[in-house]
Structures are given as structure tokens and as C-alpha cells.
Amino acid sequence: MGLLYALESIRTPVLDKIMSVITLLGGELFFMVIAVAVFWCVSKREGYYLMIVGFFGTVINQFLKILCCVPRPWVKDPGFTIVESARAEATGYSFPSGHTQNAVATYGGMARYTNKTWLRVLLIVLTVLVAFSRMYLGVHTPLDVGVS
């Protein structure tokens, strides 16, 4: 919780908005749009790959949430506050992070297929930013995003 309290101490309204936008990049809707766009516009094979990885990743993620039953950080420590705009989507258990898992599946899957170093680096940075945003918003712990 120490890292989460440190992140809580640096929150600002501007950073809250930026991190809220970044976290959307790991959302299920964004993942589905990217997978379909890759399928239609880039490669059916890569699109199928993203869809399959995303589907099974989501199933495994939900199974682990139910199996482990790890509460959200603010449930573990009622003195901890989250960015309120993130509360609506932060339902259920905390471990592992679905947004981070989606980012790893989507951007990691895309990085696997690209030969462009700059794009591969950008995709990895996006994945790390989504994981960081989940902790900044206060909805996940480092363990939640690290395992995802």
C-alpha cells in the first residue's frame, strides 16, 4: 500500500483526467475495437490471434478473480482514497487487473507481429502506462498489475 499512498499524494485534477484516459486504453471495448480493426485492416491472422488471446485472457482473469477473492485497495484499507471517476468500473475483486491483462494481450500481441522497433517500443510503453494508471487511480495494487 506504500506505493499507492505515494501515488495518492501526487494526484492532481489534470493527472486524474490523463490517467483516466490512459486506463481506457486497457478497457474491454477498446480492446475489441482494436482486434476487429486489425482483423479487417491489417491481417485476419493477427486479428484472430488478438481475439483468441483476449478471450482466453479474460476468461482466465475472471477465474482468478473468483478463485483468489482479493478485495480492492480501498476495501482493504478504508483510509485509502481512489480517484472517484474510476470507481464505477472498479467493481468486483482486485486481483488480477483486467485492464492490465487486456493491455498486455492487445499491445503485447501487436508488438509480437510488428517488425518496427519504434512501434514495438510504443506498444510496450502503452502497456506500462495502463498498468501504472490502474495504480495511480487507486483501483489496483502493484501485485494486481504485476501478475496481470
Predicted regions and their residues:
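N-terminal transmembrane-helix/juxtamembrane module of multi-pass inner/ER membrane proteins
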Residues: M1-F31, N61-G92
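Juxtamembrane helix-boundary/capping and inter-helix hinge elements in multi-pass membrane proteins
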Residues: T12, C41-K44, Y113-K116
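Membrane-embedded catalytic cores of phosphoryl/pyrophosphoryl-handling enzymes
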Residues: M19, I34-A35, Y48, T58, ...
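Hydrophobic alpha-helical transmembrane segments
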Residues: T23-V42, H99
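Alpha-helical transmembrane segments and their helix-start/interface "positive-inside/aromatic belt" motifs
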Residues: K44-V53
